[in-house]
């Protein structure tokens, strides 16, 4: 069996060199002139376009050529697709992901087959006929268990006249893909994350199953050998230099052309976005991809693979995606990244997403452009839709008051520990006592506070999601929760740093701010409770 990992080991240095060129090695005008064919681009041609685009005026020229190529070779349609998450438990430590194993604030859910079927009935009633099953690397969700969910999806789609089943999962072996194909899987989605080996290792901690770089590179060879020839490939833009990774994707796609006569079925274009409780994703890094460079990558992909579907998702704003999507692409409108969250809206998931207009409105916009909306049928009545949690859900105020009292008591303990540290931090015994107290408080916050935040999102958010007065506060609460997760990560790092430096300055400043913000959050939360609002009115 062919292996791309062996091929890429020989091509890596060439791709690295191509990514760094500052001047085109081929005339961009000639590349764009000959690009009006179904043959696409090779890495050298794409590298010349990236180099030419260092001149901003060239970017519009490249995008115009890409749109013309798509209009000629791709079908006049856009395919709708909806992700359905099965589990948020994960054994991996990917520094950018909200579901990384050590993230204390991540909501962990296994979606039972019964709940999956209930949610799928709701999704199908909305008209969706292309379903992407998504799961993290959960040892309890092996390929045989996933096969049951694939089979259930296939049965329901066939009962409605057919549709497509895609899967984004951990990498599997050839026999696993055979089994999944037999029960109804149509195509597989998998992102390499980054093709750069050393940066791949930096983003994925040792001990993670995902750290097996070669196995990930070769998964398409295994899937194709298993009879799955429709594949979605790509990278997570922002983990390394976007030119290198985009060129590596193009090299991989051309390998599939040469070796198997297969075009990539879809190309992923996700950008690194903030994830709850994940410090590495919260701020730009030197590889962050600007909107203009994102547009460039999309245009070059459109030229490189004129018939492949670019996978537009809700990580990006609606306006940005609508300015880039072209004939033949994939488009996501509804996106919940927590298992079961379509039944209970407004719950946090794997990463930050944008709200989009209603699916009917989006389809109508495409139709006005001359693009038919595929895999989105007319909506049907569904009893499940009326049982989705709504505003006005009863709230157990006594339980909330008790939890708030406990949290306030621990915040006071924390404040006292910081005060002792500021006064006596230079004395070894006092330092040891303060350190032990702070570590106990940190562990408490990582469990109790994060649980409280999750309960707030699962109970208060549905209860007040349609309340015009409360909605702005809910948006602030979600931002608070994300900041708390990041701050807990920072606090843990600062405690380790203090143990080495013996300088408590940063620890004291960070702790004081966190205490102040948590108290303000609890007070704002209490202002939402019905009894408080009644007293305010009275």
Regions found by a protein language model. Name each.
Residues 1-54, 124, 258-391:
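Auxiliary Fe-S-binding modules of radical SAM enzymes
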Residues 38, 66, 94, 190, ...:
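Conserved, mostly hydrophobic/aromatic
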Residues 62-103, 108-134, 186:
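N-terminal pre-triad scaffold of radical SAM enzymes
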Residues 85, 136-138, 168-172, 193-195, ...:
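Active-site beta-loop-alpha junctions enriched in small/polar residues
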Residues 101-115, 123-223, 230-232, 261-268:
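Core AdoMet radical
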Residues 173-182, 240-254, 317-327:
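Catalytic cores of alpha/beta
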Residues 180-187, 227-229, 306, 325-332:
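Glycine-enriched alpha-helix->loop->beta-strand junction motifs that scaffold or abut catalytic
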Residues 389-538:
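Small-residue-biased structural context
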């Amino acid at each position: 069996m062919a292996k791309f990992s062996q091929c890429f080991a020989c091509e890596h240095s060439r791709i690295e060199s191509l990514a760094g060129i500052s001047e085109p090695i081929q005339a961009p005008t000639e590349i764009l002139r000959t690009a009006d064919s179904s043959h696409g681009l090779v890495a050298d041609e794409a590298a010349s376009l990236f180099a030419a685009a260092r001149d901003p005026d060239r970017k519009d020229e490249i995008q115009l050529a890409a749109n013309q190529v798509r209009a000629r070779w791709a079908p006049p349609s856009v395919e709708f697709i909806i992700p359905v998450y099965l589990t948020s438990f994960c054994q991996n430590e990917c520094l950018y992901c909200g579901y990384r194993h050590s993230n204390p604030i991540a909501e962990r859910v296994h979606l039972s087959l019964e709940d999956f079927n209930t949610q799928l009935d709701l999704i199908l009633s909305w008209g969706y006929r292309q379903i992407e099953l998504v799961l993290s690397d959960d040892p309890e969700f092996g390929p045989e268990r996933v096969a049951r969910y694939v089979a259930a999806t296939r049965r329901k789609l066939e009962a409605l006249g057919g549709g497509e089943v895609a899967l984004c999962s951990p990498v599997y072996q050839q026999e696993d893909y055979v089994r999944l194909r037999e029960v109804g899987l149509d195509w597989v989605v998998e992102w390499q994350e980054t093709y750069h080996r050393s940066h791949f290792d930096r983003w994925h901690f040792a001990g993670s199953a995902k750290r097996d770089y070669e196995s990930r590179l070769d998964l398409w060879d295994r899937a194709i050998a298993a009879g799955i020839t429709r594949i979605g490939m790509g990278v997570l833009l922002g983990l390394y230099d976007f030119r290198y990774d985009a060129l590596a994707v193009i090299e991989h796609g051309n390998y599939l052309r040469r070796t198997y006569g297969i075009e990539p079925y879809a190309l992923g274009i996700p950008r690194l976005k903030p994830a709850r409780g994940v410090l590495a994703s919260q701020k730009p890094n030197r590889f962050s991809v600007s909107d203009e460079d994102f547009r460039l990558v999309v245009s070059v992909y459109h030229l490189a693979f004129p018939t492949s579907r670019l996978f537009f998702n809700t990580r990006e704003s609606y306006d940005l995606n609508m300015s880039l999507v072209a004939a033949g692409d994939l488009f996501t409108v509804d996106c919940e990244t927590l298992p079961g969250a379509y039944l209970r809206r407004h719950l946090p998931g794997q990463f930050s997403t944008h709200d989009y207009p209603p699916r009917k409105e989006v389809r109508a916009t495409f139709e006005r452009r001359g693009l038919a909306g595929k895999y989105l049928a007319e909506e049907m009545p569904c009893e499940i839709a009326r049982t989705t949690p709504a505003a006005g859900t009863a709230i157990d105020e006594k339980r909330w008051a008790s939890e708030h009292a406990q949290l306030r008591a621990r915040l006071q303990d924390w404040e006292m520990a910081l005060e002792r540290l500021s006064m006596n931090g230079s004395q070894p015994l006092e330092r040891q006592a303060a350190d032990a107290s702070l570590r106990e408080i940190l562990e408490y916050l990582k469990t109790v506070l994060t649980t409280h935040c999750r309960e707030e999102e699962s109970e208060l958010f549905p209860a007040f999601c349609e309340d015009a007065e409360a909605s702005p506060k809910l948006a602030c609460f979600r931002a608070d929760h994300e900041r708390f997760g990041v701050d807990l990560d920072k606090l843990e790092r600062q405690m380790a740093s203090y143990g080495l430096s013996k300088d408590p300055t940063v620890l004291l400043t960070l702790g004081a701010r966190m205490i102040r913000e948590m108290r303000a959050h609890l007070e704002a939360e209490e202002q939402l409770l019905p009894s408080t609002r009644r007293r305010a009115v009275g």
